[in-house]
């Protein structure tokens, strides 16, 4: 998605060989025009899949998930990292390691919200090693529901999250696939492939 790549180039900040900061437009401050385009792109890719719920983890996945769900006309659920007092123990739960925060969280979703007949689209801001993705898959499986696919805003293709998911048979749609953060700059997969073919 060209507008997303442009935002990454112009407003993203490479902090290391594995970390990209996008808090000026995606996961702290949100660019409403861009997030709407992101939502439209995922909705278009998954429009014929009979999606009944969109699922993400709080908090960075909330903005894109809400917009995707709006375009698909279905509810969205965010797995909570901290169980509020208002949530009973009637929950699905999974352990998820955060690459960025270097910590493990127990994520929960109320059993009242996810059911065996649901067809679930999982949305997240980043895909690196697939920890969050598999944690959300586990919750969907506990409900007896079906994961239809993954919508990833930014994929770090140099890490193995995509391979792990596709090896398990999951569909993965990423709007920006990053090959590397070499020398503090972002190189996208399609640009890398173009360079190799020259």
UniProtKB/Swiss-Prot annotation:
Converts the preformed base xanthine, a product of nucleic acid breakdown, to xanthosine 5'-monophosphate (XMP), so it can be reused for RNA or DNA synthesis. Pathway: Purine metabolism; XMP biosynthesis via salvage pathway; XMP from xanthine: step 1/1. Disulfide bonds: none annotated. One of its GO terms (cellular component) is cytoplasm. Its main location: cytoplasm. This is Xanthine phosphoribosyltransferase. It comes from Halalkalibacterium halodurans (strain ATCC BAA-125 / DSM 18197 / FERM 7344 / JCM 9153 / C-125). It comes from the Bacteria. It catalyses: XMP + diphosphate = xanthine + 5-phospho-alpha-D-ribose 1-diphosphate. Homodimer. Its EC number is 2.4.2.22.
